[in-house]
């Protein structure tokens, strides 16, 4: 059996597949001439941040999630493509906007997040939209807490976790 599992492991297409939020973090970036805070739009979302770092380390990764078919969603899609993350299961929703987060950084480096997702596209991912072949063909399946905050995406996430486990895929959870 160990030989079979090791062979199966070798044949996996991806090192890590992550499911969850892909959003825009607006981070403080100085003051305007009028003294108002300036904010910079940065790609964010813990599951995809993990994938981006793994890509830099030479790992093969893929993302499963949903963004709005809007300026920010397209920016996020372009960004994951540029860093080499497989985005074949990134879904663009024409009815719901991409989730936004305002990030306040305190003097000690700690951060506070205010999410604008009422709902956000990431919350609307459905089980039938998940390419389970990605879940089956990875060594590690990773997900985070935000994909557990709304019933629809929670059910989709649970289905992906169960599929991963049934295929002997290691499941990783970020309680972030």
Please provide the spans of the model-predicted regions.
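Acidic, glycine-rich active-site loops and adjacent beta-strand->loop/helix elements
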Residues: 66-72, 96, 119-121
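Short beta-strand scaffold segments in enzyme catalytic cores
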Residues: 100-104
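Ribokinase/PfkB-type carbohydrate-kinase core domain
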Residues: 10-18, 81, 107-176
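Glycine-rich phosphate/adenosyl-contacting loop at the front of the ribokinase-like
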Residues: 9-86
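Solvent-exposed alpha-helices and their adjacent loops that cap or buttress functional pockets
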Residues: 31, 94-95, 105-107, 133-135
């Amino acid at each position: 059996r160990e030989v079979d599992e090791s062979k199966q492991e070798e044949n996996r297409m991806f090192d890590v597949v992550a499911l969850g939020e892909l959003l825009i973090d607006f981070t403080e970036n100085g003051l305007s001439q009028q003294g108002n805070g300036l904010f910079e739009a940065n790609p964010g979302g813990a599951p995809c941040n993990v994938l981006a770092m793994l890509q830099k380390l030479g790992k093969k990764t893929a993302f499963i999630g949903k963004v709005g078919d809007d300026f920010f969603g397209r920016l996020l899609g372009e960004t994951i493509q540029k860093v080499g993350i497989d985005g074949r299961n990134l879904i663009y929703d024409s009815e719901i906007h991409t989730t936004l987060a305002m990030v306040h950084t305190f003097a000690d480096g700690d951060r506070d997040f205010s999410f604008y997702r009422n709902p956000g596209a990431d919350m609307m991912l459905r089980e039938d939209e998940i390419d389970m072949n990605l879940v089956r063909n990875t060594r590690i399946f990773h997900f985070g807490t935000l994909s557990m905050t709304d019933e629809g995406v929670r059910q989709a996430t649970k289905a992906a976790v169960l599929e991963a486990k049934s295929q002997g895929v290691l499941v990783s959870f970020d309680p972030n």
